[in-house]
Curated annotation (Swiss-Prot):
Function text: Metalloendoprotease which is required in the dorsal paired medial neurons for the proper formation of long-term (LTM) and middle-term memories (MTM). Also required in the mushroom body neurons where it functions redundantly with neprilysins Nep2 and Nep4 in normal LTM formation.
Protein name: Neprilysin-3
EC number, as in UniProt: 3.4.24.11
Substrates-to-products reaction catalysed: Preferential cleavage of polypeptides between hydrophobic residues, particularly with Phe or Tyr at P1'
UniProt family annotation: Belongs to the peptidase M13 family.
Gene from which the chain derives: Nep3
Cofactor(s) it depends on: Zn(2+)
Organism listed in the record: Drosophila melanogaster (Fruit fly)
InterPro entries named in the record: MetalloPept_cat_dom_sf (IPR024079), Peptidase_M13 (IPR000718), Peptidase_M13_C (IPR018497), Peptidase_M13_dom_2 (IPR042089), Peptidase_M13_N (IPR008753)
Residues that, per the record, bind Zn(2+): 622, 626, 682
Cytoplasmic compartment segments: 1-52
Length: 786
């Protein structure tokens, strides 16, 4: 995979973590909002003020609706559509508070209901705004069995899955394109209703082992005397697209973003981070022990002797420990320009002579009819890692034991990648390591796993299905207008920043103007001819899940290799339409908001602006601010790494960024301190995005009733609702194990600190909620970059 392609709003929900195939990632997952009935006793005195106000509101609303129904039925023949709009005009009297009635249309009532189900009025918003906004949500939404995290993102994602499932299970003749029919065939092969996978057992993998060149663990065709690492690596990388030892792909050149280039980076670890190999905590030791058990179980299922397999897999882990010791931590990989090392392949061969690099890449490119010579320029992002890796491998290749360990490691990378495509005993084998790693052994409904997997494989074909079913056309222009307003607010704020010099400020405004945005979905997916072209070379066969995954890997590899001599298409989407996320790509200077996130609770054109700007507006501001975070700021308006900042402004930017890093490093969760340096870019984007969205909201208030009248049952102004809407996006519950995993691997801060950290830096929040100086949510020292 490419090293640094895009910066996403949340951690990507994929089917694997750190190389281990899992059913659920560290991102936000979950489903339906739960509705709870009121308690049966109707004791007025026992009700609090909010409940009494709700009862009064409900009574008034019931009479209003009854009156309106009479009007509707007695005037049913009228052709004047305006007479049938269920709208209540505000009144200036007969209100319990002495104010006008709240907004009582169905959208306001629903929005109010959702907020009230989450909010905890017993918590002082100036002490803990996350608890104030989310405690009731957390109480009423325990993590379901089989899940490791449960939140707003996951609920919406799983509702999207249900929409997709309902279509995928329709007859093939109902689909509009061959690509969509391929999605259906793949989905059904994953469901495996006829249990073809169970009947085949280990056979597909054992057949593959022979094609790879054998495996010492299972005594399947491996001969140490004539085995070479370079030959096996060619097969794994260049034929089957398996990740091992290091990562490489064709990506956009950071210093010339109009062209593609071969990119090479560190890699090779199966567990999420190096810490898991070094037994830094009890949890790390537990995960490592379960990893050994997982490896051993799979080997035995493939025919190996248990004790012999365990011994050989411990050898693999010891090799991975060596990789862990030379792996550069995430927090030390944030300087884009410092990591960029272009060199010819002949130079790389001198740096890391364990591999004939020219031969390796020439072999890969033959798939698309392209030759590679010693003069080919590649970009290396971790030269020290490759040099150290070379030293390790050259030493191991000098002994028979070392060569056996290398064979075991390389083939294991293929085996563990495909265990989820085999029979149930193989799929169950990793439940233990998943439980240790994430606090849950999985167990979601098979159809959900298969919808997610189909999304990963033919995501734009599935996207066509989703868009036709769920995306409303009016959302796109409304979202585009919101982005324009937030961009304008961001630029206006730039004018007020005294720490940025005039020339840098002008160039920053130019870059902000140059940011392109893509919303909803790419147009071509609704054109069956164009969609079929995208997946024309992908072969999907009924009842052949294992082989289908092999074909998908080959298709993805070939698609990537074809890019090398092609100019960069800056309108290509890097995320499918049904995804509940958003991203910024620095080499394209582009922000993207898929249809999947342009839904309630993030966005609804019928909602008050305060709610839309607090939720979706902050997402938009977040992605826009990524263009100016500690990594994005290194790219100019054309998407190229270029020193366009004045040195004094860089110095002041670094000082302000250090304040953010210190702030978040001061937060603790489950006894562990957050890594503010690792999460710096996301924290800068969170803070800047919130500020831009709030200022845009204040500048664009409308005179619609929904934007003026209070929501029923909520004694909150719309400025306060903006912040509540923002916070409730992050309501979630997570296992302790997943919290640890996120703190060690995720570039985003945990949910509660994405709320507390940002709001405590924002003076407007303190003013709106009247938080006294020195309160937790209004500290005297605040951090601000943008």
């Amino acid at each position: 995979m490419t090293r640094y392609k895009q910066t996403e709003f949340t951690e990507d929900d994929s089917s694997s973590i750190g190389g281990i195939q899992l059913n659920e990632a560290t991102g936000h997952t979950g489903m339906q909002i739960r509705y709870h009935t009121a308690r049966a006793t109707w004791n007025w005195r026992s009700r609090n003020k909010t409940e009494k106000w709700l009862l009064i509101t409900t009574f008034v609303m019931a009479i209003t609706i009854f009156t309106l129904l009479i009007v509707l039925f007695t005037d049913g023949g009228s052709s004047d559509a305006t007479k049938h709009v269920l709208h209540v005009q505000p009144h200036q009297k007969d209100c319990p508070s002495g104010n006008e009635l709240p907004c009582l249309n169905k959208h306001c009532i629903f929005a109010s209901s959702e907020i009230l189900k989450s909010i905890d009025v017993t918590v002082d918003p100036c002490d803990d705004f996350y608890g104030y906004s989310c405690n009731q949500w957390i109480k009423n939404n325990p993590i379901p069995e089989g899940k490791s995290t449960w939140g707003t993102f996951g609920k919406l994602e799983q509702m999207n899955q249900l929409i997709i499932r309902n279509v995928l299970e329709k007859p093939a003749k109902s689909f509009k394109s061959d690509a969509e029919r391929k999605a259906k065939v793949y989905y059904e092969s994953c469901l495996d209703a006829d249990e073809h996978m169970e009947k085949l057992g280990a056979k597909p993998m054992n057949d593959l082992l022979l094609q790879i060149g054998g495996w010492n663990v299972t005594k399947s065709g491996y001969n140490v005397a004539n085995w070479t690492m370079g030959h096996t690596l060619k097969i794994l990388h260049n034929k089957y697209n398996f990740n091992c030892l290091f990562g490489w792909a064709i990506g956009e050149d950071d210093k010339n973003s109009s062209r593609h280039v071969i990119q090479i980076d560190q890699g090779g670890l199966t567990l999420p981070t190096a810490d898991y190999y070094n037994n830094k905590t009890d949890n790390h030791r537990k995960v490592l022990n379960e990893y050994i058990e997982y490896m051993t179980k799979v080997c035995v299922l493939l025919g190996a002797n248990e004790s012999d397999a365990r011994a050989q897999m411990i050898g693999v882990i010891n090799f991975e420990k060596k990789l862990a010791n030379i792996t550069i931590p995430l927090e030390d990989r944030r300087n884009e320009e410092a990591m960029y090392h272009p060199m010819q392949l002949r130079q790389l061969s001198k740096l890391a002579p364990f591999l004939n690099w020219t031969d390796h890449f020439d072999n890969a490119m033959q798939m698309v009819g392209r030759r590679v010579t010693d003069d080919e320029v590649v970009v290396v992002y971790a030269p020290d890692f490759l040099k150290n890796l070379s030293d390790i491998i050259l030493k191991m290749e000098q002994t028979e034991e070392g060569k056996i360990t290398l064979n075991n490691y390389l083939v294991w990378q293929a085996v563990r990648t495909l265990t989820s495509c085999l029979s149930k005993p193989f799929r169950d084998a990793y439940k233990g390591v998943r439980k240790a790693l994430m606090g849950s052994d999985g167990g979601e409904e098979i159809w959900r796993y298969c919808v997610s997997d189909t999304n990963n494989v033919v995501g734009f074909a599935v996207g066509a299905i989703f868009v036709r079913q769920a995306f409303h056309g009016e959302s796109k222009p409304a979202a585009e207008q919101m982005i324009a307003e937030i961009r304008e607010a961001f630029k206006m704020n730039l004018q007020n920043l005294t720490w940025v010099d005039k020339q840098t400020r002008e160039k920053a405004i130019e870059k902000a103007n140059q940011i392109s945005d893509m919303i909803g979905f790419p147009d071509y997916i609704l054109d069956p001819v164009e969609l079929d072209k995208k997946y024309a070379e992908l072969n999907i066969t009924p009842n052949a899940y294992f082989e289908n995954n092999i074909q998908v890997a080959i298709y993805n590899l070939k698609s990537n290799l074809k890019r090398l001599d092609q100019p960069v298409n800056k309108t290509n989407w890097g995320m499918t339409p049904q995804t509940v996320n958003a991203y910024y790509t620095p080499t394209k200077n582009q922000i993207v908001f898929p249809a999947g996130i342009l839904q309630t609770p993030f966005f609804d054109i019928n909602n008050p602006k305060s709610l839309n700007f607090g939720a979706m507006g902050v997402v938009m501001g977040h992605e826009l601010t990524h263009a100016f975070d500690d990594q994005g700021r290194e790219y100019d308006k054309f998407g190229n790494i270029n020193r366009w900042w004045d040195s004094k402004s860089i110095e002041r930017f670094n000082e302000k960024s250090e304040c953010i890093a210190r702030q978040y490093s001061g937060y603790k969760m489950n006894g562990r301190t957050l890594n503010g340096k690792q999460t710096l870019g996301e924290n800068i984007a969170d803070n800047g995005g919130l500020k831009a969205a709030y200022h845009a909201y204040q500048r664009t208030k409308s005179d619609r009733d929904v934007d003026i009248l209070k929501l029923p049952g909520l004694n909150l102004t719309h400025s306060q609702l903006f912040f509540v809407s923002f916070a409730q996006v992050w309501c979630s519950s997570t296992t302790d194990e997943t919290n640890l995993l996120q703190m060690e691997k995720d570039p985003h801060s945990p949910s509660q600190f994405r709320v507390i950290g940002t709001l405590s830096n924002m003076k407007e929040f303190a003013e709106v909620f009247q938080c006294k100086p020195g309160k937790r949510m209004n500290p005297t020292e605040k951090c601000e970059v943008w």
